[in-house]
């Protein structure tokens, strides 16, 4: 009969998230992880497998709270409010990040995904989920007449996703709300731009 674990799995996984998020995948050793998680190296391997497996579990935990739970919480807001609130929370998270750790998802995208095809697919699933959220809001906004930007809804959603990723990269250099919100105001204005060729000027 297996012995019960002498630690809280959710608690130690959260510690692993913090460790990987602060140091990155390559710079984090198993010894670093064990010390941060408050368990032995043997317990780490027995419970979670190797460093790569633990990184994926930490990534999943971050994505669940930082992406999927956020999407679920914002999904039923009015469409423009849902989009703007998503970005506003990103700006606030950057402001509240004195260590400038950035976004775990973006960090993983830049560090590990280019060299790990399996993990790259994992990252793309998350990016696709965010783009799908933006697409749904654009489609709902058009149905309500509050999003008037021309172009395919998925392309507009891709523009929003690209701006989001760029915002998170920039926030590691300059997380000031003034700079970040200054990037977002024109973006939000574009969503309200009239369809091309209708002869009217944007408000």
What does each model-found stretch correspond to?
Residues 85-93, 128-140, 163, 173-203:
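C-terminal peripheral helix-coil segments that are non-catalytic and often amphipathic
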Residues 101, 106, 151-170, 183-190:
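Hydrophobic alpha-helical segments that form the core
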Residues 82, 97-118:
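Amphipathic alpha-helical segments used for helix-helix packing
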Residues 12-20, 90, 164:
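Short hydrophobic clusters on alpha-helical segments that form packing/core surfaces
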Residues 8-17, 33-34, 58-62, 66, ...:
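Generic hydrophobic, amphipathic alpha-helix propensity
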Residues 70-102, 153-160:
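Hydrophobic alpha-helical connector segments
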Residues 11, 19-53, 57:
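Helix-turn-helix
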Residues 81, 117-143, 154-158, 182:
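Amphipathic alpha-helical packing segments from all-alpha helical-bundle domains
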């Amino acid at each position: 009969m297996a012995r019960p674990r002498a630690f809280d799995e959710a608690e130690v996984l959260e510690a692993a998230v913090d460790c990987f998020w602060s140091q990155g995948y390559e710079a984090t050793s198993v010894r670093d992880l064990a010390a941060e998680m408050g368990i032995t190296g043997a317990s780490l391997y027995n419970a979670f497998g190797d460093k790569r497996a633990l990184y994926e579990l930490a990534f999943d935990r971050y994505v669940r709270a930082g992406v999927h739970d956020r999407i679920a919480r914002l999904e039923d807001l009015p469409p423009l409010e849902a989009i703007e609130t998503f970005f506003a929370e990103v700006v606030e998270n950057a402001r509240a990040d004195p260590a400038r750790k950035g976004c775990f998802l973006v960090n993983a995208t830049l560090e590990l995904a280019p060299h790990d095809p399996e993990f790259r697919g994992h990252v793309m699933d998350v990016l696709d989920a965010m783009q799908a959220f933006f697409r749904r809001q654009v489609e709902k906004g058009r149905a309500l007449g509050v999003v008037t930007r021309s172009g395919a809804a998925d392309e507009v959603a891709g523009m929003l996703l690209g701006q989001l990723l760029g915002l998170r990269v920039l926030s590691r250099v300059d997380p000031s709300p003034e700079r970040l919100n200054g990037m977002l105001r024109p973006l939000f204005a574009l969503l309200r731009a009239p369809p091309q060729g209708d002869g009217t000027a944007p408000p």
